[in-house]
Swiss-Prot record:
It is found in: Secreted. The gene is cwlJ. It comes from Bacillus subtilis (strain 168). This is Cell wall hydrolase CwlJ. One of its GO terms (biological process) is cell wall organization. One of its GO terms (molecular function) is hydrolase activity. GO terms for cellular component: extracellular region. The lineage of its organism: Bacteria, Bacillati, Bacillota, Bacilli, Bacillales. Belongs to the CwlJ family. Pfam families: Hydrolase_2. Gene3D superfamilies: Cell wall hydrolase SleB, domain 1.
Length: 142
């Protein structure tokens, strides 16, 4: 059962995001990107207050670099749609289980990203989650 509302167009949009942001990280990496996106929708805190739809979350200004590149606009594949559905249905995996941010640095992961603590690295991406004081909803929305 979905933890956020999603149409088939939303599933396709999410699938395209997963591929464009993390195809090189494999299925696990794409699921982690999906976790961050769904967390942003569910948390309603920090930079993500007021997001209500997958479309809003993906096209939020400066949220995902992938939307500025042509690869994002290519058709989603069935395998990517399946991963998107798993994220939409609430499958959460460490280190993105409570993360709201990730990025791909040139070198080591900084201990903090915009004052939010580092959780772990998965392949090339560093994941960061808010403190409970900053965003308690991310810890109790599922």
């Amino acid at each position: 059962m979905a933890v956020v509302r999603a149409t088939s167009a939303d599933v396709d949009l999410m699938a395209r995001l997963l591929r464009a942001e993390a195809e090189g990280e494999g299925k696990q990496g794409m699921l982690l990107v999906g976790n961050v996106g769904i967390n942003r929708l569910r948390a309603n805190c920090s930079d993500f207050k007021g997001l209500r739809t997958i479309r809003q979350m993906i096209y939020q200004p400066h949220a995902f670099e992938a939307v500025t590149h042509g690869y994002f606009y290519q058709r989603a594949r069935d395998s990517e749609r399946a991963l998107a559905r798993r994220s939409i249905n609430g499958e959460r995996r460490w280190p993105a289980k409570f993360s709201l941010w990730y990025f791909r640095p040139q070198g080591d992961c900084p201990a903090q990203w915009y004052n939010q603590p580092f959780v772990a690295r998965f392949k090339s991406h560093c994941f960061y989650q808010p403190t409970a004081e900053t965003c308690e909803n991310v810890y109790n929305t599922f």
